[in-house]
Amino acid sequence: MRIIVVDNYEEMSKKAAAMIASQVILKPDSVLGLATGDTPIGMYKEIINIYKNEKMNFSKVKTFNLDEYYGLNRENPQSYYYYMMNNLFNHVNIDKNNINIPNGMADNIEVECKEYERKIDKAGGIDLQILGIGVNGHIGFNEPNISFESETHLVNLNEKTIESNSRFFSSKEEVPTKAISMGIKSIIHSKKIILLACGSAKSDAVSKAINGKINPNIPASILQLHRDVVVIIDKEAASKLKLK
C-alpha cells in the first residue's frame, strides 16, 4: 500500500486524475471502476480537462460503477446514473454502450446483481478501481460487518450512511434505505485500487482502515491485503494516521 498525503482537495483530485489518465493512455481499452459522492467530483473535473486537451481518449474504455440507490430511476437527479452522466460521461467521448451502472429499478435484483458480475468478468475484470471511504469505513455501499466474500448485492444502508447522504436530499426521509453495490470480493479483485479521502471527518475511518486490524466492521481494512493500492488523502484525513 502506497500512501500519498497532499495539502488539499485540489491536489488530491489532480493526482487521482493523472493516474487514471496514465492508465487509459497505457491501455486504451482499460476497464475502470468508478465511484460517486463528493470526493471524486474534483477528480472528474480534472479528467475532463485532460480530455479537452486531447491527452485522453475514452472511445474504448469500459466503466463499472460501484453502486446505485435502489428505487431511484435514472432520471432522478440523486441517482448515481444521473451523477455520472452529469459529472463525466456527457463530457467525454465514451461509448454509452460501455457504461455500466447497476439498475436501481430492476424487477429482479438477484438477476441484476449476477448479471453485473458476469459483465465485469466478461470485460476481463477491473483494471483500476476508484474508491471513497465512508465515515464508518464503508467502501461502495458495503456497510460494517459485510462478508469479505460478498459480490454485487442489495444492501440495507447503515444509519450513519443515510445521515451522511441526507445532505444531497431535501430531507433525511428522502434518502433511499437500500442500494445495489459491488461486493468486497468484486472490489478486491481489481488489478489496481486508488482510495481517496479528504477532510477531518474521514480521519477515523482512514486510520482504522490502514492502521487497524483487518476487520469486517471496517470494510476498507481489507485493502491492506491488496497488492496494489494507492491511498491519496489530504492532511486532515491523514491526521490520525500512523505513518511508518
Swiss-Prot record:
Q: Which domain of life is it from?
A: Bacteria
Pathway(s) the chain acts in: Amino-sugar metabolism; N-acetylneuraminate degradation; D-fructose 6-phosphate from N-acetylneuraminate: step 5/5
What this protein catalyses is: alpha-D-glucosamine 6-phosphate + H2O = beta-D-fructose 6-phosphate + NH4(+)
- Entry's CDD domains? GlcN6P_deaminase
Q: What is its EC number?
A: 3.5.99.6
Please state what class of enzyme this protein is: hydrolase
Any GO BP annotation? glucosamine catabolic process
Q: Which GO terms describe its molecular function?
A: glucosamine-6-phosphate deaminase activity; identical protein binding
GO terms for cellular component? cytoplasm
Q: Which family does it belong to?
A: Belongs to the glucosamine/galactosamine-6-phosphate isomerase family. NagB subfamily.
Q: Which PANTHER family match?
A: GLUCOSAMINE-6-PHOSPHATE ISOMERASE
Which HAMAP family did the record assign? GlcN6P_deamin (MF_01241)
Q: What does this protein do?
A: Catalyzes the reversible isomerization-deamination of glucosamine 6-phosphate (GlcN6P) to form fructose 6-phosphate (Fru6P) and ammonium ion.
Official protein name in the record:
Glucosamine-6-phosphate deaminase
| Provenance organism | Clostridium botulinum (strain Langeland / NCTC 10281 / Type F)
Gene (UniProt): nagB
